[in-house]
């Protein structure tokens, strides 16, 4: 209900685009025929819509996603510079849609809004006005989780330590206790200078989940400045079947999770001149949390010895992470010492520990 009402606040007429858009919005779309139209309407439902470039990237959908996209183009495009564009491609995964969308983006800033998500139209209108005059490499805002099953929006404020509208040097926010806490710039909160992103010359892993973590790394490598505005814009839809953040999905796709982690570790080797602040940021905000999560997946969710041993053996090649105190906790050290033969007895061991502690 929240989703549909936002897209129907007013009637949207045909929209005349501009040669140099302020914001390029890439919409990765796979089997989202039930969501795409309403989501796009929320992006266009304001007076600054003509300054936006929407790039729908259909990732080999098996439903009518392409048809919906073409209907949106017919409904709203007019003039020499279409507001809505479509890339229709074979399935290559979420990363491939961002790769292809960025290539053709012409806006001053670039961001991603998934095909089953939506935005607050009024706040997006305000953001476009801000981006017109803003020059920071990254502009961050707030977002909310849309828990559809209970029809509730849960606002997420992760940049409250920043003074709204003040430009910060990214490097200065990389130090523990002062800058970014759990998260820095992420897909749900951030607009990135388009040319900066293109100059980074990255390619997200294709046909793979969890590439948002790769994006979080690539997007800050060349960033020098960052600014925050307290506008609640993005609506992250929670509750769709098959979302990659579920326990079952983590178990099913654990090899892809490991692949992304090791891709990031290898990428760090290719940028030896990156500042210590940014390197620490990447390790603390991306690599270490992913590594801890993976030990949870292979050690607690699966409890299969070979999964644990294979991952642990491979990680040993990256000593800084392998021995990191947040990674090499008591659980991990115990199963390393015992060759992971006791993984299947985790539940029993935990119960014994609780009795002993009492």
Predicted regions and their residues:
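Glycine-rich, basic loop-to-helix element that forms the pyrophosphate-binding segment
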Residues: 88-105
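Membrane-interface aromatic/basic loop that binds lipid-linked glycans or pyrophosphate carriers
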Residues: 1-5, 136, 298-358
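Short aromatic/hydrophobic "clamp" motif used to bind/position activated sugar donors
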Residues: 110
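Cell-envelope/extracellular polymer assembly enzymes that use nucleotide-activated donors
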Residues: 21-24, 53, 214
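N-proximal low-complexity "stem/linker" segments adjacent to membrane-targeting elements
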Residues: 1-45
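Acidic helix N-cap motif at the loop->helix transition within catalytic regions
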Residues: 37, 63-72, 122
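Donor-binding/catalytic cores of nucleotide-activated saccharide
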Residues: 115-226, 236-252
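A conserved acidic beta->alpha catalytic loop
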Residues: 42, 58-68, 92-93
């Amino acid at each position: 209900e929240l989703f549909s009402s936002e897209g129907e606040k007013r009637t949207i007429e045909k929209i005349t685009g501009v040669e140099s858009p302020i914001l390029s919005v890439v919409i990765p779309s796979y089997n989202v025929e039930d969501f795409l139209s309403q989501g796009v309407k929320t992006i266009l439902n304001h007076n600054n819509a003509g300054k936006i470039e929407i790039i729908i990237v259909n990732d080999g959908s098996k439903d009518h996603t392409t048809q919906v996209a073409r209907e949106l183009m017919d409904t709203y495009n007019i003039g020499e510079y279409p507001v809505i564009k479509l890339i229709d491609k074979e399935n290559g995964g979420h990363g491939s849609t961002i790769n292809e969308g960025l290539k053709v983006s012409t806006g001053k800033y670039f961001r991603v809004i998934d095909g089953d998500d939506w935005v607050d139209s009024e706040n997006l209108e305000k953001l476009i006005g801000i981006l017109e005059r803003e020059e920071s490499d990254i502009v961050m805002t707030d977002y909310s989780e849309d828990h559809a099953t209970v029809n509730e929006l849960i606002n997420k404020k992760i940049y409250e330590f920043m003074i709204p509208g003040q430009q910060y040097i990214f490097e200065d926010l990389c130090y523990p206790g002062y800058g970014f806490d759990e998260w820095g710039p992420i897909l749900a909160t951030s607009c990135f200078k388009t040319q900066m992103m293109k100059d980074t010359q990255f390619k997200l892993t294709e046909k793979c989940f969890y590439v948002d973590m790769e994006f979080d790394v690539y997007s800050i490598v060349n960033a020098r400045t960052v600014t925050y505005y307290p506008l609640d814009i993005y609506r992250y839809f929670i509750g769709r079947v098959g979302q990659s953040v579920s326990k079952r999905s983590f178990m099913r796709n654990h090899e892809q999770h490991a692949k992304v982690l090791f891709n990031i570790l290898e990428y760090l080797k290719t940028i030896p001149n990156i500042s210590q602040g940014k390197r620490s940021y990447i390790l603390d905000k991306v690599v270490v949390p992913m590594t801890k999560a993976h030990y949870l997946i292979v050690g607690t969710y699966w409890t299969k010895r070979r999964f644990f041993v294979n991952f642990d053996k491979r990680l040993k090649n990256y000593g800084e992470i392998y021995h990191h105190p947040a990674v090499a906790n008591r659980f991990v050290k115990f199963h390393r010492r015992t060759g992971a033969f006791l993984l299947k007895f985790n539940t029993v061991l935990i119960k014994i520990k609780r009795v002993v502690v009492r």
